[in-house]
């Protein structure tokens, strides 16, 4: 029947589109891998850069926890002086919604060229990506994936101009390889706010590097 023929045609068109997208992603990923290999970069250096980022996030988390405790102590002392009782601020429950529900964690609309956990080959050696790499257009807006507070906005070797958001309950998001940073440390942001402009990298492929971390550990942003 005509309806069956139309359905089959639509299925073929969708399959063709998906095949084309997959092929484009493979080509971009291959180009990115070639650039990594062509730069004076070794897997060891990349891993050292990742360790530096991990140490930075852990340090930021400790500072935020200490600041929260100090604020609680000040509030308790002030309440005691005034003769009033105050409730101790509770630690927010783990934000499972940060990963499992709501809009996908895409800070930019560009195509994904490398996913969390995928193999990464540099100079003949292989390990796995700790974050997600998006293809971008230079200077396009990079958006906060959830509400949070800026706890780092500066250059970091291996990640270029980097911005890190604290979302509470041990969750942090990391946005690297930016052309410019639009927010400063201490700024509070809402989901969807432009926090930076993408596209600063050494090679011909402009990419944004994105990570989700929980209690310092990189995790899959797709859940």
Regions found by a protein language model. Name each.
Residues 104-223:
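Catalytic cores of peptidoglycan-degrading enzymes
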């Amino acid at each position: 029947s005509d309806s069956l023929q139309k359905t089959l045609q639509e299925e073929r068109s969708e399959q063709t589109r998906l095949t084309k997208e997959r092929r484009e992603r493979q080509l971009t990923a291959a180009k990115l891998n070639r650039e990594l290999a062509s730069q004076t970069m070794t897997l060891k250096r990349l891993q050292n850069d990742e360790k530096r980022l991990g140490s930075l996030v852990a340090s930021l988390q400790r500072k935020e926890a200490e600041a929260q405790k100090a604020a609680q102590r000040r509030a308790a002392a002030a309440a005691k002086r005034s003769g009033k009782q105050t409730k101790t601020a509770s630690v927010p429950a783990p934000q499972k919604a940060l990963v499992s529900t709501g809009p996908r964690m895409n800070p930019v609309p560009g195509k994904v060229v490398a996913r969390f956990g995928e193999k990464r080959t540099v100079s003949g050696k292989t390990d796995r990506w700790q974050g997600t790499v998006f293809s971008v257009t230079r200077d396009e807006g990079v958006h906060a994936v959830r509400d949070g507070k800026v706890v780092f906005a500066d250059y970091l070797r291996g990640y270029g101009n980097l911005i890190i958001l604290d979302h509470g309950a041990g969750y942090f998001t990391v946005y690297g390889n930016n052309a410019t940073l639009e927010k400063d440390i201490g700024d509070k942001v809402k989901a969807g706010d432009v926090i930076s402009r993408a596209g600063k990298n050494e090679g011909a492929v402009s990419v944004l590097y994105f990570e989700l971390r929980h209690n310092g550990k990189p995790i899959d942003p797709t859940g």
